Each structure stands twice: as C-alpha cells, then as structure tokens.
Design a protein with these regions (language model features):
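Short Lys/Arg-rich cationic patches that frequently serve as NLS/NoLS or arginine-rich RNA/DNA-binding motifs
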Residues: 1-12
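Eukaryotic acidic, Ser/Thr-rich intrinsically disordered low-complexity regions
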Residues: 108, 112-135
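Structural signature of alpha-helical solenoid repeat scaffolds
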Residues: 54, 89-90, 124
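Alpha-solenoid HEAT/ARM repeat scaffold
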Residues: 14-18, 32, 47-51, 82-86, ...
Length: 135
C-alpha cells in the first residue's frame, strides 16, 4: 500500500516531467522534437508544442510541420485545436489552400463555439477576398 506522501511525491514528479517537457517545447529549435512533443498525451505539452509551430515562429515552409498541424485539427483538447486554427491562418503558404479550406470547414463544425465562430470568420474572409491568412 502506498502512503499519501509517496503518492504526492509521484504526482510532483509527474508535474516536474510535464514542466520539463513544456520548457523543452519552448526552448528547442529542433522541429522534429517539437513535432514529437505535439503528439504527447498531456494537452499542456501539446499546446506548448503547437505554439512553437506557429508560422510566425517557424519562419519557413516545412512540410512535416504543416502535416502535423493538419493532423491536429481533431485534437481532443479545445485549446490545442484553437491554437492549430490560429497557426493555419497565420501564414500558411498558398500551395496549401485546399488543405486550409478543408481544415476551416472542419473547424466550422467544431463542438466549441469559439472555434466555430473563428473558422466562420476565416471562411467568410476567404469567400469574400480569397485570403485565409487573416489572424
């Protein structure tokens, strides 16, 4: 039988690991590592990784980054999906137009009203002006 102190120590250890992974996501410049962290079971780690995958921070067109972002449109965590939506509409290259539109249509049916609202605004802008990089 585990004591309460042992359980607390285990929880603190887990929290420290999560904090270390979030810090790694913030500090590493290795996009393969960031992509790997974006697949972590902990939503806070995934969120931190996705923030690092924003085009304004990546500053390059990296296929594996875009592929991972499009995969994450169905993430279970609302905060992660919202950040993915932001990333897709903050500098995605022209050659990804069909994937961007498909992602926005998916987000337009999301269970979260804020994500739906933002996707609706992006789609309206796209239909009106042809531009989706509006965030």
């Amino acid at each position: 039988m585990h004591s309460k102190k042992a359980k607390k120590g285990h929880k603190e250890s887990d929290n420290e690991k999560i904090s270390d992974l979030k810090r790694l996501a913030q500090e590493t410049s290795d996009f393969a590592e960031i992509i790997e962290l974006s697949d972590h079971e902990n939503a806070d780690v995934r969120l931190q990784a996705v923030k690092r995958l924003c085009p304004c921070r990546v500053q390059r067109d990296i296929d594996s980054v875009w592929q991972r972002l499009f995969e994450m449109t169905e993430d279970e965590d609302t905060r992660v999906r919202y950040q993915v939506l932001h990333n897709i509409c903050d500098g995605s290259p022209d050659h990804l137009e069909s994937q961007v539109v498909e992602a926005m249509e998916k987000f337009n049916r999301d269970e979260d009203k804020d994500i739906r609202r933002r996707a609706h605004k992006v789609l309206a802008s796209y239909l009106r002006t042809g531009k989706w990089n509006v965030l």
